[in-house]
Design a protein with these regions (language model features):
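Long, non-transmembrane cytosolic or organellar matrix-exposed soluble domains/tails
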Residues: 76-99
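Conserved binding/recognition cores within well-folded domains
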Residues: 1-80
Length: 99
């Protein structure tokens, strides 16, 4: 019933909650994968991810651009994530500490 999959961490861009209940969508360098889980469960398994919004977990090392005014993060695949107002500074610092 349960499938297990692994991706190199550097290929993970971000995860978002799905419109379908109790599901999460994973965006990677090559794939888009939807599976049953919560962001909280994923975060417990992979603490290198950063929660930038209640609906998103990101891999800060793959952020291409941070737009503080619009509160958006952009990724190499053209995807974007929202940043909660109170998380902008934390996300900005995490990205700056990587580069």
């Amino acid at each position: 019933k349960f499938a297990q999959f692994q991706y190199p961490f550097k290929e993970v861009y971000y995860l978002e909650t799905s419109p379908r209940a109790h599901r999460v969508i994973l965006y990677t360098k090559t794939d888009r994968l939807e599976f049953t889980a919560s962001l909280e469960e994923v975060f417990k398994q992979e603490p290198r991810l950063l929660q930038c919004h209640r609906s998103f977990l990101i891999n800060p090392s793959n952020v291409v651009r941070l737009d503080k005014k619009e509160k958006l993060l952009y990724f190499p695949n053209g995807g974007s994530c929202l940043i909660a107002r109170y998380k902008v500074r934390e996300v900005s610092e995490a990205i700056n500490n990587l580069h």
